[in-house]
UniProtKB/Swiss-Prot annotation:
Protein name per UniProt: Alginate lyase
Function description: Degrades alginates that contain guluronic acid.
Enzyme nomenclature, EC number: 4.2.2.3
Keyword RNA-binding: no
Signal sequence region: 1-20
UniProt-listed InterPro entries: Alginate_lyase_2, ConA-like_dom_sf
Cellular compartments annotated: Secreted
Length: 307
């Protein structure tokens, strides 16, 4: 059950007239509360293009990296070779970034502002400035393709959902399928702020191995794994100092993991949060045209009201 609150950003299927000869994700999804990064640099500024809220909602599409499927799903694709979002990033992405300002450029994108949200464990003064308090992200999707080339600890990895903070990620949710397996694993990382402890890893289905720290691991195929093209759902909920991640599949019990964030540093003044969803390729060593791809059929973000 979702906690009560005010919905401030959501993507749900609804019917509107097509805006273009070729359907775009904005024809089926409400995208005014999101921006998009795609792995191309059409303006030659040395970074991946950022599609702002109004342009995205008006029917933006990219035939290579961001399209609407025949079944009405929002398709994200990111090859290994492509423009990156910053000099500090070495992986490509086709990924939405939550924007609570919904195109109001008088509101700053960064900082504790109406564009971002904070935890209910943050100071009350910060809650009053934010666009929302606490957050839940729900998605239904299928991962359609993962990389099959590159070093063994990077192959097959893709991030499908995140909470991002000022400089760190309270959660990065991964899907990962190895080339010789038919089914993949799901796991996540919780990254405390710098100076607040080491990164923590949680396996939900299968294993995260092989990893950078265990490159010789040869795990067996996860018995309850998720195949490419198989539809599943996830829920990421951050309430106060508690982070709860839930995986849902028809005919199977939910898989739930909870993390105590009380010592992770995200309740302090100045810390702001936002959701991200799509595909963030976690392979930089494979063939340039090798890629990750996922189709989202539902994506909904909710938040409590400011205090």
């Amino acid at each position: 059950m979702l906690k009560s609150g005010v919905m401030v950003a959501s993507l749900c299927l609804f019917s509107v007239p097509s805006r273009a000869a070729v359907p775009a994700p904005g024809d089926k999804f409400e995208l005014s509360g999101w921006s998009l990064s795609v792995p191309v640099d059409s303006d030659n500024d040395g970074k991946a293009d950022q599609i702002k809220e109004k342009t995205l909602a008006a029917g933006y599409r990219n035939s290579d990296f961001f399209t609407l499927s025949d079944a009405g799903g929002m398709v994200f694709k990111a090859p290994i070779s492509g423009a990156k979002t910053s000099k500090n990033t070495t992986y490509t992405r086709s990924e939405l970034r939550e924007m609570l300002r919904k195109g109001d450029t008088s509101i700053a994108t960064q900082g504790v502002s109406r564009n971002n949200w904070v935890l209910s464990s943050a100071p009350l003064s910060e809650q009053k400035k934010a666009g929302g308090v606490d957050g839940t992200l729900e998605a239904t999707l299928s991962v359609d393709h993962v990389t099959t080339t590159g070093v063994n600890w990077q192959v097959g990895r893709v991030i499908i959902g995140q909470i991002h903070a000022n400089n760190d990620e309270p959660i990065r949710l991964y899907y990962r399928k190895l080339p010789h397996h038919q089914k993949g694993s799901v796991y996540f990382a919780h990254e405390p702020r710098k100076g607040f402890g080491d990164e923590q890893w949680y396996e939900m289905i299968g294993t995260l191995q092989p990893s950078h720290g265990n490159q010789t691991a040869a795990p067996t195929e996860p018995e309850a794994g998720i195949a490419l093209g198989e539809t599943f759902s996830y829920r990421i909920d951050a309430t106060g100092n508690k982070l709860t991640v839930t995986l849902m599949r028809e005919g199977r019990p939910d898989v739930v993991k909870t993390v105590d964030m009380s010592k992770s540093g995200y309740s302090e003044a100045g810390q702001y949060l936002y959701f991200k969803a799509g595909v963030y390729n976690q392979n930089k060593t494979g063939k340039p045209d090798d890629y990750v791809q996922a189709t989202f059929y539902r994506l909904k973000a909710t938040h409590g009201a400011q205090r």
